[in-house]
């Protein structure tokens, strides 16, 4: 392996990336073979990266000519990703050796696009949309750049030069950004320029503008995929049948296995598959890959559909691989009849040894590989009838043991499993593997674009082989990089282990990054969609800092969450100069500077509560909240209060603060305002929370499975203080108004009837964003009858507010 790592580092790969590639049983042999084909031992980084990209995109059609492309890269004939993409497409249909001149023309070999040509090409595009650019200004910049990148005359131009020229021409046309491009900044500048003593209004907060599906899919290779019917088939009639069935429309699918909850990585897959279909006027199916009856559960079937809909997508059809069990069985028989499938009785150890073993030695054919077709058909029938024990017989595909791709080493097509299937019961005791069922289900459904993550790159060759072997329509498989985030793990096996050890309670624990867990925490689905769409679609496998996701969550909640006051750790305050029965209604906005959220009224009385964090017994010059003999403002209350006495319990803890309401005489404006909650039972104040759950990252390190930083394994990296529970927190009555507003909507009634309460989200002012947890006891009847006493409210912190350097002052 060390030799492979050194060899891959010669391409310019970083040591970590080289080690990862060398350990990839699918990628390593392909990349090693391409390096050998070039006849070189050292490469500059651009050349090395192109060879690496080629290794990740080789398919059966391109394999006979992969070495040719590698040599073209090494000699500089293919010098860009665009040229490489064109080369692989050409080689899928034609022989470059026999048609070298045509290959060169198709791939832009030797084409040099000069600076003047770049300028002219960019100018042509900008002139064609000049009116809309002048109207939209910099808001239309992204769309314009996408059009420039697709301009035929700029196809082989240096992308860096194109971008620089584009920026220069946009600046010349529109001038520098001004108030038309940032209205909030314009208002701020206008206010600052006025010589007035009148109070200056705070600038309008910048609107959250999440990335769209169109922006996610408008750049890179995914924006240049084939049109339906352009993908080559083993015979022409298959294309005609396919187009007749699809009417030329795009059809994609999202194919999860129902053996667990979907996670944050699946959010990207859902957006890619459903999004590609939506943006191309097509449809997307939800197909459950339910070929393993031992792993699947109805709970996960229901959860997956619910999660897809929660993210805002609706499948055109809801299908199951098990819908096609009879058809798949018949295709397996056809595979055997074509001499391309055989029944094998080898053990796992024998199969591993025949494939070269751990030493990667020579591969040898299984002793059953050349058994007569009639014998394999008879043995397959015995398997179907349950006359073999599990693992005593399997159906294997007769591919190519000499191929450098391990996916071609006669993979298993069918195996014996004596388990009851969640849909077909005990009808079957033989089940197709993923390798057999996946591509054939795609074919049966006439999928035009089979979009999956890059770990299936080498599986693409076997995917195409099988479709051709049984003479069915062959979809195109295209891969993109999967998504992970830091400070978590997504493996179901590992999550179950930490659950069984008691570190979490369930797989929807709000500290996890399964989608049901994020939903339970209160994360809005539009924030998750915005996060994955902003990242775009590339072939790179990315682990994104979780802070980036949290920023999207925070920005989204800032737009949609009403503001209410809460005190998590209350201290009683008595305003000594107000009468016992003092009562005043204070009108509060649900969101300052946004009238669309409306207002609500809360009581202001002689007794109220503030948070313990807003009081100090020992004052300091840089502290501006409440302290003995010091005043502070109360949010939206006309006058400040000043602390005159601290009363304590026998144990020394604070019993209550005696304060004076400074409503007589002229008072200086307080430097700070704090939240408060009135003690007014007749007005239902305060609203008492049973629990406030404060969540922090479950793991301490960005990668809990990295042996270099976490040598004792991911269990040792668990933050045992990642959940804090506060009892006795108080909230103003505005929370109940928010709940009643939600319950008054049709959508709210429906969700509450299913006990889905996570859509009830608020900002606790100066604290963070929160949502009701499913452990809340809250009925529609209680809400309609204003029966707050029987409610048992449990609330989760979704995310903190943005860091504020003055928050502790």
Predicted regions and their residues:
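Glycine- and acidic
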Residues: 251-260, 284-291, 443-451, 509-515, ...
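Extended, domain-scale alpha-helical bundle/helix-rich regions
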Residues: 116-190, 506-603
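Active-site cores that bind ATP or allylic diphosphates and position pyrophosphate for catalysis
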Residues: 338-495, 503, 553, 562, ...
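Hydrophobic/aromatic-lined pockets within catalytic cores
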Residues: 278, 309, 336, 340, ...
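N-terminal Rossmann-like or analogous alpha/beta NTP/dinucleotide-binding catalytic cores
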Residues: 1-365, 455-478, 482-491, 496-503
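Conserved structured core elements
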Residues: 160, 256, 264-267, 298, ...
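Core subunits and conserved enzymes of cellular information-processing
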Residues: 456-457, 464-466, 529, 533-535, ...
